[in-house]
Curated annotation (Swiss-Prot):
Its cofactor is Mg(2+). This is IMP-specific 5'-nucleotidase 1. The keyword Aminoacyl-tRNA synthetase does not apply. It comes from Emericella nidulans (strain FGSC A4 / ATCC 38163 / CBS 112.46 / NRRL 194 / M139). It catalyses: IMP + H2O = inosine + phosphate.
Length: 451
């Protein structure tokens, strides 16, 4: 009998962002009807310019209409009728928006950067819509309440996969600029180290530049924190430490129901996950090592080898299924995440519906995040990035989700651990450290224009 997991894997519905795909489909109609692929560029320059102008107007009208639908969806959420908006009927997987999104204005900006309306052979793409949504989110943050906290993923967001944040990285001056503006900065990474030295090795370039920066005050330096293991270890900047970081005890930042998680249950869940991982290693003959940590367990390839995507996804799905069917897994809600599968998301949301202001439920619960943080390994972590971002908000005095931006690259593919941050803050979806630099420069431009 075909299982639900195998069907979902085959359909790959969890590899699509439904809102982006829906908007992309709307934009395909004017592209098909108004593009002129047979026109000769030199002979029809005037005609092509007119067509580009007309196409821009039609695209802009679509984004204006979608913006109105988003505003209507937000109004329904505020009135307690989130499931009854027209957008929810059109895109059932659409989630919570913490700010308005200025889509029309964002499209005008990105069209000037990417010349979307002038293209005759390539329709508006997934990446076009993704970047327009990023711009719309930045505009929403600056237009409304302002920005108080920016959190970043590590790999592929601040530095290349498996690399370190070196002193010559162009992202460092942008982070320094955020701190100078009084904006708090958190680095929320899947790397689960219990000591400062490992994080210093990864972030040495940034930490040393901060120490030597004469235009940073001590108060501004203290606005940088590092959350490791998704949501398990917090470190703050400390210039007096040899590694520029100091461990923050859990009781100083743990939030709500996280304090109710029993060590016995955590150990039992990780034991089950480890057993399942070892079974996968044997069954698939994986050339990997098993690593058990305080609040995580996972597998990674030996000798810097590579695993196929199918091997990684099979391992993730097997472990997710095993933990879910265990006694402790059925007793305590958890999140076993492998991309944007409707089942995984709905299972999480049944226990943790998105809220504009987070309020921990009365009953204790526990979450597990099963991810591929580096793209070539599988780790089971207690908690996920929604808890990591919330803990950062709590540490800085309770910053509202509508004043928080999480920047990350993993919102779609298997092991997309940044996806959960959408439950705790606004988000920007980037694809490389270079895009992070562009995003922060765009934010600075918007802040100056609207100041």
């Amino acid at each position: 009998m075909t299982t639900r997991y195998r069907v979902e894997y085959a359909l790959k519905s969890h590899r699509r962002d439904q809102l982006i795909e829906w908007i992309k489909g709307l934009l395909a109609v004017p592209f098909v009807l108004h593009s002129q692929p047979t026109a000769v560029q030199e002979e029809d320059a005037t005609k092509l310019a007119a067509v580009a102008h007309d196409t821009h107007q039609r695209y802009a009208e679509i984004f204006s209409d979608v913006e109105r639908l988003l505003n209507d969806h937000i109004d329904h959420e505020l009135s307690g009728a989130a499931g009854k908006s027209k957008l929810k009927l059109l895109v059932p997987t659409v989630g919570t928006f913490f700010t308005r999104l200025y889509l029309r204005e964002a499209f005008d900006y990105q069209d000037r950067q990417r010349f979307i309306s002038r293209r005759r052979f390539v329709a508006p793409s997934f990446n076009d819509v993704r970047l327009i949504l990023n711009s719309a989110q930045l505009l929403g943050l600056v237009h409304t309440k302002g920005l108080e906290l920016v959190t970043f993923d590590g790999d592929v967001t601040l530095y290349d996969d498996g690399a370190n944040l070196n002193a010559d990285s162009p992202v460092i001056p942008r982070i320094i600029r955020l701190l100078q503006q009084g904006i708090k900065v958190g680095i929320v990474t899947a790397a689960g180290y219990t000591d400062e030295a490992k994080y210093y090795e990864r972030l040495q370039g940034l930490l040393d530049v901060m120490r030597d920066a004469s235009d940073l005050t001590d108060e501004q330096r203290s606005a940088l924190i590092v959350m490791g293991g998704e949501s398990n270890y917090l470190f703050r900047y400390d210039a007096s430490s040899p590694h520029r970081l100091t461990y923050v005890p859990r009781e100083n930042w743990v939030i709500g129901e996280m304090a109710t998680w029993e060590e016995e249950d955590i150990t039992q869940l990780l034991n089950i996950a480890e057993s399942s991982l070892r079974a996968c290693v044997a069954n698939l003959n994986l050339p990997v090592s098993v690593l058990r940590k305080d609040r995580a367990v996972g597998v990674f390839p030996k000798n810097r080898g590579r695993l196929s995507r199918e091997q990684l996804e099979e391992t993730v799905l097997v472990v997710q299924n095993t933990v879910e069917r265990s006694q402790v897994g059925s007793r305590l809600p958890f999140c076993a995440f492998n991309g944007c599968s409707p089942f995984f998301v709905s299972h999480y949301l049944r226990h943790h519906p998105p809220r504009r202001k987070y309020k921990p439920p009365i009953q204790p619960c526990m979450l597990i995040s099963i991810t591929q943080p580096g793209g070539n390994d599988v780790f089971v972590d207690i908690g996920d990035k929604s808890w990591g971002v919330r803990a950062c908000q709590q540490y800085f005095g309770g910053i509202d989700p509508s004043r928080t931006l999480h920047v990350g690259d993993q919102f779609l593919s298997a092991g997309a651990n940044d996806f959960k941050a959408r439950l705790a803050s606004t988000t920007a979806w980037i694809a490389s450290p270079a895009e992070t630099v562009q995003l922060l420069d765009e934010l600075d431009t918007i802040q100056k224009v609207l100041a």
